[in-house]
Amino acid sequence: MRNTEMIPNVPVSFQRTRRMSKGRVLTSGDAGKILPIKADPILREEGFSGNVNVSVEMMETSEKPVNAIVAKACTYFVPYLAFDQFNGSIDELNRSYSKENGIAGSPISFFEKNKYYNGSSVVTDSTPTDMDTGDNGRSTFYGTMGLHHGVADMNSSYVQAYNAIVNHRRKARSTSLAVRNEFEHDLAEAFWPNEGNSHIMADFDQKLIDGEVALNGLTFSAPLRSTMAGKNDNSLTSGLATSTTDSFSPASVLADVTFGSGILRPDGTTGSAFLFSDVWAELTQGGDARMSLADIEQARKTAAFAKLRAAYDGIDDEYIIDLLMQGITVPTEVMKQPMLIGSQTGMFGFSQRFATDSGNLDDTATNGFVSLGYRVRAPRTSIGGVVMTCLEIAPERVWERKKDYFLYTTDTDNLPNALRDSLDPEKVAVVKKNHLDVNHSTPDATLGYAPLNHEYNRDQINVGGKFYRPANDAYTEVRSRIWTNETTDPSLSTDFYLCTNLHKKIFADQVSDSFEITAVSDLTVDTNVVFGQRLIEADATSDYETITNLVDATRITK
């Protein structure tokens, strides 16, 4: 007998099965973009594990590139709660899944369908026929993934998952990077690889580093003094009269006098006002500032908790951060953002071939190749979502004019000093714009901020000899083997973080896609899905009927 005072809320248990989610991809793309390679749907109450392998071939270049070219493959699990229509609410997701009205009273579609972003607003295609060939990036997005669209509705889960990944990474990198619309189909810019300047920040929390100690005993009234005061006058001079009805000395400040109307006020208007010169307050009377050891300890604890809170940057809801800071577990919070479940980075290796005909023995052709592989896994979740594999290809950025701080040191006082630096209360250095380019037009302007003595964690790339960059940035053929964006007057703008406007001058074919990509994914999914038995092809004669006819169905009659 069931205890009638208990209502069960455990879901019905089914025999678990396994389903395969395999994929082979052949596609192409350019460097400087985050390429969506493969997407696998994960249903509710499913977990998975498997392998992802990606191979990339770089198309022919006339010369062998001299700087590193990096490929990075990463696979994310994007839960459905990361999609905007659910607003991070598991209750909203469950209602939507069951086609019930949402919390606001109106139904919410579990699958957004036929939507794309046109640059200013989200558009719903009422007669979807061209999602794989349409404008606003749709043909590029679905074409890169190798997906075709028939005359039917198409859900937007893949593009939503893609943009959730991009936005998650941008928030983690810098608050200055723009967030994309979740239905934007244009391919996002890739991040620069092996960035040796990621320690430089545009701003920092100075209060977090300095700390603040409250001083008690300063809530008192202090006498206010002035060497000269007057009214109804546009200015004060040393010869100001003190006996007329329009002016007064400090000794008669409290006198009952009549205001005039001719004073030029700080806001530019004219009217009645007093003018004071050399104003000060006497703080020696009535005040007693105190700072206790408890105040110092409070400042230390405040700074420590502020550092913990800073780690939650990127979570949109302040109340969620407040709950986490109180030590309260928010079970669904981890399901509101993409989860990196596997990644690998590799550099291209090059194969150079020389011409064999007698007239062109100096001519060469170069191809590059890189292979990446890793395992992925995720436990069983009640949410479900999309597993998406993305690929980024970009050359290593070459800061040829990056400052060598030791070379510019002419005084030992400018070298690190353990005692002085240990006593430094902030341990933060101001980074000038000549850090990235010693020929910057405003070398002493502030680029950003970095940890103290950051310049002695050296990460230099020096290019010299025939490859030396000329002062006027004039084009030289030999330097065309360096594949990079030569930025004039670099700053902490979008170009500093993302591969914007990456050229294709090093390739023999500057029109076609520069990289050919093959990928193989093999996932085993633990699921509740019920599969039918394997079918056996049969002819017109039923095997079941044949066997039935052989059975003696008669019974003995008594």
Which residue ranges define each predicted feature?
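Intrinsically disordered, low-complexity segments
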Residues: 1-558
